[in-house]
Design a protein with these regions (language model features):
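Short amphipathic alpha-helix with an adjacent loop that forms part of the alpha/beta core around
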Residues: 235-246
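Adenosine-phosphate binding glycine-rich loop
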Residues: 282-283, 288-347
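ADP-ribose/adenylate-binding Rossmann-like module
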Residues: 212, 249, 254, 260-301
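Short, catalytically relevant binding-site loops at active-site mouths
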Residues: 193-195, 216-219, 237, 257-259
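Glycine-rich, highly charged phosphate/nucleotide-binding loops
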Residues: 227-237
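Short, charged/polar "capping" segments at the starts of alpha-helices
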Residues: 217-221, 293-296
């Protein structure tokens, strides 16, 4: 089974508790900066005896879980939004950690009236149907379906901004919006043995995963249970299969040199036409192969009229240099490079 978005267990527990009449609270990181263990968007559901998710772990998380349980036991339904400073010398709001970062944590005891929003959020994550989670001091917890979000003022700006996964406005009239589903989409072009191994590794890394191949009845594609989407396509139409976006990652590993070349020509041509504000339609574009093979592919792209600047966007040979040999080892080296691309601002 494909892995669901990381937050799904949080909302599933919250929905089940509300249906059963069991007190439950949500914890959420609305802002993070520096070396904060909890990143923006991290969430937990907390009951008297169980939890789902995480807001960063350690003593800070333990204290917030205990505070949530105290609120649930006392029946205090007032939300609490508080900064947490991970420095010993901080004059206030010390978290008990020394990571040197900061995060704003929201404690939100859920009420029966929240069930409709919680259920809708759970369903959107299960089906990958999109929409927005919206939290605010003024309107509480809401789910906005895609069509509504597109006409909802400030949310409309986020809906049309491919980079706008989370948006937070601090202060007394605080507000938080988050696009539901996976932030990052990984497309593997080629459905062979390394593709299958990479799919299994990427399943744990919170990617929405698509695997494409031009070969029907390919056993390694048919048996790929980690991919959310599997399609047999004509590589001449590859550009139409991969929408542009700053959270799009593309790994090319087709059956051979010729099909790699076809795919890369179309994707680099797409790069000329579909640039994002960052100047390139994809966060990552790489091709698997030996140094000799990749050099030959680059030569072919030059012969096809692509500039050195355009060709420089292509990464290859892909994977961190860990002397990998087996499909599983190669997959781990590629996954590590994808993480590097995800976390490096100047990648």
């Amino acid at each position: 089974m494909p892995s669901p978005p990381r937050d799904l267990p949080v909302w599933t527990l919250a929905a089940a508790c509300l249906r059963a009449g069991t007190p439950v609270a949500l914890l959420a990181v609305l802002r993070s900066e520096g070396s904060s263990p909890g990143r923006q968007g991290f969430k937990m559901a907390v009951t008297a005896d169980t939890v789902a998710g995480s807001i960063g772990g350690g003593i800070m998380e333990h204290k917030w879980v205990e505070l949530a349980r105290q609120r649930l036991q006392s029946g205090d339904a007032m939300p609490l939004l508080r900064p947490q400073v991970h420095r010993r010398e901080a004059p206030a709001d010390r978290s008990g950690m020394m990571c040197s970062g900061e995060q704003d944590v929201l404690l939100w005891p859920l009420r029966p009236t929240d069930l409709a929003a919680v259920t809708a959020i759970e369903s959107a994550l299960q089906t990958l149907s999109g929409g927005f989670l919206e939290w605010s001091a003024a309107n509480g917890l809401r789910f906005l379906p895609p069509a509504t979000a597109a006409t909802d003022g400030a949310t409309a700006a986020a809906a049309t901004d491919l980079a706008g996964f989370c948006d937070y406005q601090a202060g007394a009239a605080w507000g938080y919006r988050e696009r539901l589903g996976f932030r990052d989409q990984l497309t593997i072009v080629g459905g062979g043995h390394v593709s299958l191994a990479l799919s299994n590794v990427a399943a744990a890394l919170d990617f929405e995963l698509t695997v494409l191949d031009d070969r029907p009845n390919l056993p390694t594609l048919d048996s790929n249970q980690a991919a959310h989407h599997r399609r047999v396509i004509d590589y001449e139409n590859i550009a139409a299969e991969i929408p542009a976006g700053p959270h799009r990652y593309v790994v090319v590993m087709t059956v051979g040199y010729r099909t790699d070349a076809v795919v890369l020509r179309h994707l680099l041509h797409r790069a000329r036409q579909g640039r994002t504000r960052q100047g390139h339609p994809y966060r990552y574009l790489g091709v698997m192969g030996s140094t000799v093979k990749v050099a030959e592919l680059r030569w072919g792209l030059r012969e096809a009229g692509f500039s050195e600047t355009e060709i420089a966007r292509l990464r290859g040979p892909i994977g961190l240099p860990i002397q990998s040999q087996t499909p599983e080892e190669i997959a781990i080296s590629i996954a590590a490079e994808l993480i590097q691309a995800r976390r490096s601002a100047d990648f």
